[in-house]
Amino acid sequence: MQNELNHPYEDEIALLQEEIQELTRQYKEVQTEAAFLSSANFKQALQSYHGIHIPDQERMKDTACLMAQIEDCKNELQFLNNLSGLEFTKYLKKTEHKSDNQAIYKHRLVGQCQSLLFQLEFQTLESKSRDNASQSVIDLNIIMECREQSDLSKFVSRVEERRNLLLFFRSLSSFAEWCECRKNTFAKFKEKYPLAVGLPAGASAEYMTLRNPQNPGCELLILWRIHIDDEGSVIPILDLLPKIPEQAVALDKSGVVEGAASGFRNLLRVFGIHGSIERLIQSFCCLSDTDASV
Amino acid sequence: MEQAQSLFREGVLSHLEQLEALSYNLAVKQEKQRQEWAALRKNQELVLELRKKRDELKAKIERHKAEIQAFRGREEAGEDHGSAAGTSQQAMLELCVEELKGMLEMHWLTGISGKRTKKGVCVCISTAFEGAYLDSFHLDIALKPSVGISRHSVPPFIPLEQIAKEHLQTDLKKFLSVLFEHLNAYAGRKYQFQQLQSFPGGFVRDAQQGNSLHTVLTFGYNVRVEKQPFCLRAKLLYGGVTRSLPTEAVITCEDNRPSVQEKISSHSSLFCQNPLHRALECISSEDETLNHSSASLLGTHMF
């Protein structure tokens, strides 16, 4: 009978211990979330560590250990950034639901890929069965500034709809790399041929203009789009658009202007992007040696 | 005499023995009771302590939640955040470590992740089809003294050597990105084939992969055209090894009537533009609604 009297307490103890465990986990999460929202705090904590005395010896040892861990993680992350082209600046993972064989997590991630910033909110479902574990994305929201790039914004909404998080990262990485390549190429030509090459919308824009300094009325527009297809493959598409006054077009009996675009495409196939633009400038702009050597 | 003596001895001694046993049992019982009471008291105290701890935690969580709400409010108002009250520097550092570790784990979801090793790097390439994460592949790449793959789990039909020859020495990032495209497309095709096998046998049958790269796939499926059942044979060709959708879908049927041929051409574009299981779901639901409407037409006809 005495034993029976003990039971209610034991049950309650077990329940309480379980509840405390769960609450501790929740506490950690809200703590992380609060910290995530006030990211300034990380910096404060780090700064105050570097600049001040810590009275307690024990604590100093702990803190030093933590600092070493932070340093390790940062190095490892830097290494991964170089491999994948993706850089994460803020991250928060929260448990939404947990049971014996499955768990739902909510993630918030802020990061960038070259000059493209992104913010993601997504949920993952991890389920375990007897012989395997699986993971899937069950909800995906992407916030990105891509008004100027219609291809990218179309891709983003397609990826959201299909919850293809992995493809988003991979395609974004190669898209950003192509953007960087385009920017560098444009800037390099502008530097090499300052009189012939124009970048009216800046080096990051989709086009650059070519003109012959001796004949400013005629202009060629090199349009360089970076297309992302349905399956996430990134393909650069270059086009040549002549901007020639009507009078000049009337004089063009052999259809040079009309054939310019297809001619340029052939050129691309043979010489590649860089070589084609170079040859185009040389021939169209008829540059004197002085300009070319600048 | 002897008999009386033994009787007397037994009587008194057994009585004493009984008394002794009684007192012993009583002592044991008392001790046991005392212990149980003590345990009970201890448990009572523990319960109180745990309750207190729980309530404290709850309060702390509430406080942080309120804080988060406040931050959200300020975030919306576009103000700069202050510092979270009541979190020590030590705790902040711990959280920082947690966040960084989370970021490291997060890389697994991006397709290319890895860990540095003594000689180089151990890369993990993960694959996914739409939201579902599929197989991962690992490569041990030595960077010093020279770049080379020491071990890997990439299937033999993926042209790893060729990709390595083209990019590994010059650009590790490019190498991984090309290899990823091959592996992800292969995993995606394999996944669709597995999905195909889970359709009921009455609808889809004889599903067969043409090769281990899963670039050729054949199966038969049943449809109803003008209320008549037909069996169509489909052959899907995946022309690009870095693609997970077919480049060509050849569908054949023994019957040549125009309505069947029409169906065939619509299915062919459906297969080329959609994941296989999605396309088949679409075909089967189309069929069902047709059957339903024809059944109801039949019904009205009868009455």
UniProtKB/Swiss-Prot annotation, chain B:
Matches recorded under Pfam families: CENP-O
Coiled coil: 38-77
Compartment list: Nucleus; Chromosome, Centromere
Keyword Nucleus (UniProt): yes
Any one biological process term the GO annotation gives: centromere complex assembly
Keywords of this entry: Centromere, Chromosome, Coiled coil, Nucleus
Record-linked CDD domains: DRWD-C_CENP-O (cd23836), DRWD-N_CENP-O (cd23835)
Covalent S-S links between cysteines: none
Keyword Lipid metabolism: no
One Gene Ontology cellular component: kinetochore
Function according to Swiss-Prot or TrEMBL: Probable component of a centromeric complex involved in assembly of kinetochore proteins, mitotic progression and chromosome segregation.
Family statement: Belongs to the CENP-O/MCM21 family.
Protein name: Centromere protein O
Species this chain originates from: Xenopus tropicalis (Western clawed frog)
Gene (name only): cenpo
